[in-house]
């Protein structure tokens, strides 16, 4: 609904219960336009209200759980009651004085242009129309072309022109005067064209205080960049309206409502402002120069003075920054063109103590180098909602997902960090500040030249886990542009050795004070490297230079589901469902089904006419919609029997449905039908007029409604006769059979009124746990011989056929002979029937043929599965002379494919009977043992590859490789191999490698490792089962989660209640596990096996548990001079205390 000039939102929009995204950009909606209605919509996820007329955030929005909310910068409100301000009036031509006639016409044209231009937002309109004082008196004609510097007298005016935002041709940078002497705190800002912009005051902030703009994030509100700025600290790097990061020299147009742009940019355009630090005496908010009039435009001499002052300020900032890093402030400027300087106001800075810098190493700075000011917040109590300058979420957007920090910078040191995916020369300078620790003291020692930090905390890996971090105390990044000409450094002197404290090498610009690893910056290539630190114990070398170059890069191969799957964007759930935000839960699905059934069960007055019932009631439309989906087991397309008295028209509607007509004609229906539709000799249904008043509960007459699913169970609950041998319950509004006798269960499975596919599935999967085949045959025979109509007999034969097809592996030879004897008795009974004998005999002959083909092995259940697309070509090429296969040379997705093929072959060998035996008796059948041994072998192989890597660099690369393999297995829905790989990384022998894990915790690989490790925790096994149940086949489940759950179900629930009732709730839970594994067995993967790789994955050398622990201990002894200290702020390499 964007760009529609909407002025109001109707309250009826809240009736859209499944609305997730609303786009209302560029409309005319205000706070009283009904926007607050969106606060009552719980399903809303995305809302765009940019370029509207909102003046404040509606209070109802705080309750929404939005993933995206786009708003304009809020229009600030005055805290105090402001006086009525006079509007600017057009000058009137007086007949007595016509000397200013030309000027008056020009001003009138300006007013017309100003009135014709529609404001982009209320904020711009406020900036245009607000005035703090009365309008100036009309000047004379002489004042228009005056060059006098006295611009605030009554003889001069400020020209009223069109807002520069609407001036698309304006390219020159604006000149803002930042006078330091005799400036009022509440002075207005005057742009280069003379437009007076009054100072903005917020609702909860006193006049003259610090001004902020606010931006809404996904979960909370965090303050954005400073709203009003006369410096260039936020012109070098700022946020646009979409939350991205742009440079000021970009050619793209800037949104006028961009959050984080300075107020000077909002008025004058996107060019960086040039600060004029003249010491002129200005008052009343005016700004200007002695050689300028109207606050802008000036002579060349004034502009040259401005450039000189800007260079002087830039030099001072360089010196300050140089002292912070522990170096001298001597710098040489090679160029002085286009150098914006940094204003020392209005940002307060923290106290920085700089004693002595290293003067032995001169540093050259290029004049073209742009330096941004390091901003520190002032101490004080700050509301956590408005505490940091930048939240971790905004930093994530600014860095454009390039958030990898290879090594944690030390506390208090401004360390250039190379960002992942950046090109040469793309560096940022990070300063870690804290909102809680107000004063930061950076001091230096004469001997060590090493800065130390007091009361300073930071978090190095916050970008990887920004969802779980708060805005308080989060680090803030500011860009420090690097000059095009690298400075020249003299040859470094020998490093200073000290046993107590590490020294700073003369060639190094930065040092980590908390570790022996010394970080250096190579200015010639503009890349960050790390020098090699040696220890005095055992001469062990920790090559941090190689470690710094190691980085985790995702390597997940896509397919038709998703062409470019990435864990960093989708996480584990997104890899399984790339096209869905989330899967509907079972509870939500059950509620939808219950609501649809409840609508169908609406009571209709028995005295109402048929025409009114079918034309006006929602029953007809609901029943017709569900009847079209009668082939789906999730929808039962018929109403309950107890809901209608007059059913003639409804019966006609049901009979007109193809699925219902098949049922009444003896055809195949859902859940197993017979071949009676081929003969068509079944007794026709009685006329509708004859069955209008017939009770549905009478089993001796032909029923006119066939119920399925939940409606069938719900109808049984209303029958007083059936309730004698059955107990019902309800789960989330869905009716369930709780306890039942075997005789009643047989009756329900062959009931003439309907069927429940769920009840049939429970029986076929778990009947061997509570009964036996001979006992079931006995009850079926009794049901067939005592049936009062041919429909019951037909249902018995249909159920027997389905039983043989699904559970043929359960039948032994004696069971087959018993079944044939039962069918022979049924044949004799059919011969005695007068009607329907031919149809029943045909169904019986079909069942006998199926049994004979099953015994001979000639029965074909279904055709061989075919795929629409060919299998992907294996991504593996073996060289002719290469005998051995190296793990690091293989692609992760191809290893995952071969692991999936191996696991699926072993999974298909497990039978249903073996699953039941394991759940009841914990019997280890050969098929289950093979799956278990394969899982344990994969765990040992991964652990062996990690431990046998000789250096820490190789161990890190090996872990990165296995993380990518696990992610590819997860994407292929091979949960078994993915869990095995992560279980190997959780072994105690692997977790002993503290140096290795200390580095990995600060890389992108840590996020998927931790998320996978959480799934294998005992408390999260239920969550893993829910994920496996929600995916579609093909998939390979982690059987450990299913088997442990089945054992707990069997041990914690009784099989027989009150000595005769079968506990159907227990077997319902058991049946769900069996069905999940069965579905995974039936669906195959469309992959190509590679014999060489499969042999490599099955015959590789592995170490035992004892050998793994021994090798890991040796690695720890070699690296005993270093330990890893893990805190909530990251991992830091420290020297072990003796």
UniProtKB/Swiss-Prot annotation:
Biased composition (Basic and acidic residues): 393-405
GO biological processes: Ras protein signal transduction; response to differentiation-inducing factor 1
Compositionally biased tracts (Polar residues): 263-275, 498-511
Keyword list, A-Z: Guanine-nucleotide releasing factor, Leucine-rich repeat, Repeat
LRR repeats mapped onto the chain: 1-16, 18-39, 43-64
Chain intervals with Pro residues compositional bias: 487-496
Keyword Repeat: yes
Domain Ras-GEF, chain residue ranges per copy: 891-1118
GO cellular component: plasma membrane
Region of interest (Disordered), ranges: 126-180, 239-301, 319-360, 389-411, 473-540, 601-643, 660-680
Gene3D superfamilies, per database record: Ras guanine-nucleotide exchange factors catalytic domain, Ribonuclease Inhibitor, Son of sevenless (SoS) protein Chain: S domain 1
InterPro entries: Leu-rich_rpt, LRR_dom_sf, Ras-like_GEF, Ras-like_Gua-exchang_fac_N, Ras_GEF_dom_sf, RASGEF_cat_dom, RASGEF_cat_dom_sf
N-terminal Ras-GEF domain sequence ranges: 733-855
Keyword Membrane in record: no
GO molecular function: guanyl-nucleotide exchange factor activity
Biased composition (Low complexity): 140-158, 326-352, 512-540, 605-634
Biased composition (Gly residues): 283-299
Identification of the protein by name: Ras guanine nucleotide exchange factor N
The organism of origin for this protein: Dictyostelium discoideum
Protein's gene: gefN
């Amino acid at each position: 609904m964007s760009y529609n000039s909407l002025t109001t939102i109707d309250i009826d929009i809240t009736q859209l219960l499944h609305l997730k995204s609303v786009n209302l950009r560029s409309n005319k909606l205000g706070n009283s336009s009904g926007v607050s209605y969106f606060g009552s919509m719980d399903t809303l996820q995305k809302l765009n209200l940019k370029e509207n007329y909102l003046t404040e955030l509606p209070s109802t929005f705080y309750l929404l759980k939005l993933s995206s909310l786009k708003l304009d910068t809020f229009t600030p409100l005055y805290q105090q009651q402001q006086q009525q301000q006079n509007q600017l009036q057009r000058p009137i031509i007086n007949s007595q004085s016509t000397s200013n006639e030309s000027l008056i016409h020009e001003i009138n044209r300006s007013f017309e242009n100003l009135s014709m231009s529609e404001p982009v937002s209320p904020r711009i309109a406020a900036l245009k129309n607000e005035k703090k004082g009365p309008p100036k008196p009309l000047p004379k004609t002489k004042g228009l072309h005056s060059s006098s510097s006295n611009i605030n007298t009554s003889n001069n005016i400020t020209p009223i022109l069109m807002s520069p935002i609407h001036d698309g041709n304006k390219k020159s940078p604006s000149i803002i005067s930042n006078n330091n002497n005799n400036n009022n705190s509440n002075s207005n800002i005057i742009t280069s064209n003379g437009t007076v912009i009054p100072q903005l005051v917020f609702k909860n902030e006193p006049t003259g205080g610090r001004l902020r703009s606010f931006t809404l994030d996904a979960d909370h509100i965090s303050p954005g960049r400073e709203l009003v700025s006369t410096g260039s600290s936020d012109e070098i790097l700022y946020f646009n309206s979409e939350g991205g990061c742009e440079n000021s020299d970009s050619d793209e147009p800037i949104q006028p409502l961009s959050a984080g742009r300075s107020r000077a940019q909002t008025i004058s355009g996107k060019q960086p402002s040039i600060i004029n630090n003249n010491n002129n005496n200005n008052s009343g908010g005016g700004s200007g120069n002695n050689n300028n009039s109207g606050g802008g435009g000036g002579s060349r001499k004034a502009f040259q003075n401005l450039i000189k002052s800007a260079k002087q300020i830039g030099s001072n900032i360089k010196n300050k920054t140089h002292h912070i890093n522990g170096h001298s402030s001597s710098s040489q400027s090679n160029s002085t063109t286009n150098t914006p300087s940094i204003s020392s106001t209005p940002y307060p800075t923290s106290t920085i103590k700089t004693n002595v810098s290293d003067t032995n190493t001169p540093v050259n700075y290029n004049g073209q180098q742009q330096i941004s000011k390091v901003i520190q917040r002032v101490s004080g109590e700050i509301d956590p909602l408005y505490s940091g300058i930048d939240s971790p979420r905004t930093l994530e957007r600014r860095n454009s997902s390039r958030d990898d920090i290879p090594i944690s910078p030390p506390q208090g040191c401004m360390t250039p960090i190379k960002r992942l995916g950046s090109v040469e020369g793309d560096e940022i300078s990070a300063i870690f500040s804290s909102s809680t620790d107000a004063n930061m003291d950076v001091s230096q020692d004469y001997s060590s030249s090493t800065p130390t930090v007091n009361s300073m905390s930071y978090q190095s890996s916050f970008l990887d886990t920004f969802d779980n971090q708060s805005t308080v105390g989060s680090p803030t990044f500011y860009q420090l542009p690097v000059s095009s000409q690298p400075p020249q450094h003299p040859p470094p002197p020998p490093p200073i050795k000290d046993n107590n404290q590490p020294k700073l090498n003369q060639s190094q610009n930065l040092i980590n004070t908390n570790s022996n690893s010394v970080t250096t910056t190579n200015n010639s290539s503009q890349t960050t490297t790390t020098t090699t630190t040696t220890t005095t114990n055992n001469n062990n070398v920790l090559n941090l230079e190689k470690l710094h170059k190691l980085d985790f890069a995702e390597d997940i191969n896509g397919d038709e589901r998703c062409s470019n799957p990435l864990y960093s964007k989708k996480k584990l759930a997104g890899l399984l469902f790339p096209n869905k935000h989330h899967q509907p839960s079972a509870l939500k699905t059950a509620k939808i089904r219950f609501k649809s059934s409840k609508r169908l069960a609406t009571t209709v007055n028995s005295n109402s006419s048929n025409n009114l019932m079918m034309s006006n009631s929602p029953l007809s439309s609901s029943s017709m919609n569900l009847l079209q989906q009668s082939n789906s087991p999730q929808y039962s397309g018929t109403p309950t029997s107890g809901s209608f008295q007059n059913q003639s028209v409804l019966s006609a509607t049901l009979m007109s449905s193809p699925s219902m007509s098949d049922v009444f004609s003896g055809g195949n229906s859902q859940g197993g039908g017979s071949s009676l539709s081929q003969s068509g000799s079944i007794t026709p249904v009685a006329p509708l007029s004859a069955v209008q008043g017939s009770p549905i509960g009478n089993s001796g007459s032909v029923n006119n409604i066939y119920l399925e699913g939940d409606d069938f169970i719900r109808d049984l609950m209303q029958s007083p006769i059936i309730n004698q041998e059955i107990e019902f319950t309800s789960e989330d509004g869905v009716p369930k059979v709780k306890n039942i006798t075997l005789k009643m269960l047989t009756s329900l499975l062959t009931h003439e009124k309907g069927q429940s596919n769920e009840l049939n599935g429970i029986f076929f999967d778990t009947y061997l746990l509570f009964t036996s085949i001979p006992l079931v045959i006995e009850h079926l025979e009794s049901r067939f011989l005592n049936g009062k109509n041919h429909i019951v007999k037909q249902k018995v034969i249909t159920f027997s056929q389905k039983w043989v097809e699904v559970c043929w592996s359960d039948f032994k030879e004696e069971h087959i002979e018993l079944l044939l004897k039962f069918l022979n008795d049924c044949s004799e009974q059919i011969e005695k029937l007068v009607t329907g004998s031919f149809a029943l005999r045909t169904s019986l002959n079909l069942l006998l043929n199926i049994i004979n083909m099953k015994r001979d092995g000639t029965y074909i259940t279904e055709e061989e599965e075919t795929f629409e697309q060919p299998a992907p070509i294996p991504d593996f090429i073996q060289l002719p002379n290469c005998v051995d296969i190296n793990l690091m040379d293989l692609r992760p997705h191809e290893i995952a494919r071969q692991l999936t093929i191996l696991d699926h072959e072993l999974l298909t060998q497990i039978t249903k009977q073996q699953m039941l035996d394991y759940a009841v008796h914990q019997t280890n059948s050969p098929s289950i043992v093979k799956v278990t041994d394969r899982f344990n072998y994969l765990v040992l192989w991964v652990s062996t590859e990690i431990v046998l890597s000789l250096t820490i660099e190789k161990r890190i690369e090996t872990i990165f490789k296995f993380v990518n393999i696990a992610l590819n297995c997860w994407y292929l829905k091979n949960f078994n191999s993915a869990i095995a790989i992560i279980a190997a990384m959780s072994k105690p022998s692997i977790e002993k490698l503290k140096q290795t894990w200390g580095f990995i915790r600060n890389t992108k690989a840590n996020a998927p490792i931790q998320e996978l490790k959480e799934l294998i925790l005992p408390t999260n096994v239920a969550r893993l089962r829910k994920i496996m149940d929600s995916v579609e086949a093909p998939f390979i489940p982690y059987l450990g989660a299913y088997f442990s759950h089945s054992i707990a179900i069997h041990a914690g629930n009784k099989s027989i209640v009150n000595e005769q009732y079968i506990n159907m709730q227990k077997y319902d839970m058991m049946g769900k596990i069996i069905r999940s594994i069965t579905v995974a067995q039936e669906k195959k993967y469309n992959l190509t096996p590679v014999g060489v790789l499969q042999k490599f994955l099955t015959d590789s050398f592995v170490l035992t548990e004892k050998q793994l622990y021994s090798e890991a201990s040796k690695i720890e002894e070699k690296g005993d001079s270093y330990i890893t200290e893990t805190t909530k702020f990251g991992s830091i390499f420290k020297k072990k205390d003796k």
